Amino acid sequence: MDRIKAKINELKQKLDQWNYEYYVLDDPSVPDHVYDQAMRELIELENAYPQFKTNNSPSVRVGGFVSEKFNKVKHKRPMLSLSNAFDANDLRKFDQDNQNASVDLKGYVVEPKIDGLSISIIYKNAKLHQAITRGDGVNGEDVTSNILTIKDIPHYIDQKYKDYEIEVRGEVYMAFHDFYEMNDNLEESDKKFANPRNAAAGTLRSLDNSIVAERKLSAFMYYLVNAQELGIKTHYESIQFLKDNKFKVSDLIVKVDTIDEVINQIDRYTKVRNDLSYMIDGIVIKINNLEVYDEIGYTSKFPKWAIAYKFPANVVSSQLLEIINDVGRTGKISYVAKIKPILLDGSIVEYATLHNFDFIKEKDIRINDEIKIYKAGDVIPYVDGVDLSKRLANSVPYESITNCPSCQSVLVRENDEVDQRCLNIYGCKKINIEKIVYFVSRNCMNIEGMSDAIINKFYDANLIKNVADLYYLQKHKEFILASDFKIKDKSFSNLINSINNSKTRSLEFLLTAFGIRHVGPNLAKKLAKQFKTMTTLMHANFGELTNVDACGEKAALSLINWFNDDHNVSLVNQLQQVGVNMEYIDDFIYDDNINIIDEYKNKTFVITGSFSISRDEIKTILEKYYHAKVKNSVSKKTDYVLAGIEAGTKLEKAKLLGVKIIENEFWKKDNNF
């Protein structure tokens, strides 16, 4: 059982990290099918071992996060994600479930699944009032000013609807030709976008709407949320409403009568997908009859009346010209295939990841082989295997490198890991540069203007050798402006301002920026919330660390080893001396208008289920405003159980014991949420 629980926790940590990369960083590190496979494995394990299923599992949450850059807005109706189908059997099961729930589906509507960023647009008095990203499904980001720059989205709808509040949902995307043009026009020091989806998401989240307008985003609308209020009875009729009101709607949308016709549409979409001017990664199937949606129902994560069929990854073949070796910030050695340029998913591909030498050996990949590749979410595609029928007669197996490609140190494998590593972590130039690149990145200290190219130039000029040196760049101003760095006075001032702003970031960002092995952004946030200060964390023992949710033995040992290293202790002290914040800053803002209900004061609470805010935040409200005690288990001494979505066994026990239950909706109403 311990092994099963550990596997479930491992999958949850991976999926949480991948969700963060996809929704917050707009920079996924794994392809969709790897994510989907992990999610399916998690769901299967949780179904088989329900005692290990928690309410904060990725399997019951809508993917996504709310950015700190924009105002947070609560959706009037949750923006749920869709369950996935991967073959005809999944679609037939979806159909059978629908037939069992309702006899009047009125067929299905089949739509392209646009690979972009979901958006909800609200019209009041027939005028565009507000635009909100999906976010975490409950709360999104207000991006109204940016949406107003997109030509596909009308600012007004027909005046006959001025007495209605109309909510329309769709997908913001970037067409291939606009994506290529934008990447070509980026400054040399700017990071290129990996793909149109990343470009669309990153652009829509820009704080400068002139940049949004310049980059030419597009949008398809596909859902009229309050169609029934307008007397519309079918989803296909609501699509016509969108067309009539000048919204851009895909001309690939069709209505069919049976699930067999839906399955036939897969072939149709597969044939046209590579000829489209935009990226699609599947099709969406919705029941046509709007009047049965509530009858068929919802889970906490997705509607049961719709499903997404995901295309398998596109696989193409190209010749392997060379294997390139590199070293990353942790000393890990990477193997990258340089291939004959080939078109894949709308972009020219010249490189593909080979992971490590064991992967090359297992697949028996050789120079000049014809290799199969597929596009992942990242810039570099993945290698799927070798076409042995095209192997040259004189080919020889590839030999592993034994020395670091940067500093020539002898490579080692630690604890039987598959990865080779350079252990010269303080003397290797490439490792030091990659540490700085990671430190300044968006999900770390977010120092804008410090591009990879500038970091390399500053390193070669001995201006920065470690991350602490960044905070002394101001004193080198005259030298930098006079040198051949192509940095002007205004750019330098902006860079220094960004460096100074980074000093005020909360502890979890600094902890992430250190790049400690096994400590990603999610765990860093939990550690910061638990220990509050860098000093307390530095002195935490193994038991205290592993008591933190999601901090396993590997992460705990890695933290202890990192803080026991004199180089790292010195670095922390240097950063503290220049004024970098070393404390956790709570980003939860309490509402001064919370109603204080006297009957809740000084009582004992148990919290179960999911809410629009975290349980820690609810616990803080109860303790701060009600002086309540919050316990983990229900007993006869429990006064109230606060029950959210998908409440579990604690709710059942409360009912058996006769404990008072506060439902989520009543809690929100009582507290002005």
Swiss-Prot record:
Q: What InterPro entries does the record point to?
A: BRCT_dom, BRCT_dom_sf, DisA/LigA_HHH, DNA_ligase, DNAligase_adenylation, DNAligase_N, NA-bd_OB-fold, NAD_DNA_ligase_OB
| Catalytic reaction equation(s) | NAD(+) + (deoxyribonucleotide)n-3'-hydroxyl + 5'-phospho-(deoxyribonucleotide)m = (deoxyribonucleotide)n+m + AMP + beta-nicotinamide D-nucleotide
Question: Which superkingdom does the taxonomy of this entry point to?
Answer: Bacteria
Active-site positions on this chain: 113 (n6-amp-lysine intermediate)
Q: Return the CDD domains for the record.
A: BRCT_DNA_ligase_like, LIGANc
Q: Tell me the cofactors it needs.
A: Mg(2+); Mn(2+)
| EC number per UniProt | 6.5.1.2
Q: Which GO terms describe its cellular component?
A: cytosol
Q: Where does NAD(+) bind?
A: 32-36, 81-82, 111, 134, 171, 286, 310
One Pfam match, given by its short name, reads BRCT
Q: Which residues bind Zn(2+)?
A: 404, 407, 422, 428
Q: Which GO terms describe its biological process?
A: DNA repair; DNA replication
What broad class of enzyme is this? ligase
| GO MF entry, a single one | metal ion binding
Recorded family membership: Belongs to the NAD-dependent DNA ligase family. LigA subfamily.
| Role noted for this protein | DNA ligase that catalyzes the formation of phosphodiester linkages between 5'-phosphoryl and 3'-hydroxyl groups in double-stranded DNA using NAD as a coenzyme and as the energy source for the reaction. It is essential for DNA replication and repair of damaged DNA.
* Protein name (record): DNA ligase
Species, as recorded: Ureaplasma urealyticum serovar 10 (strain ATCC 33699 / Western)
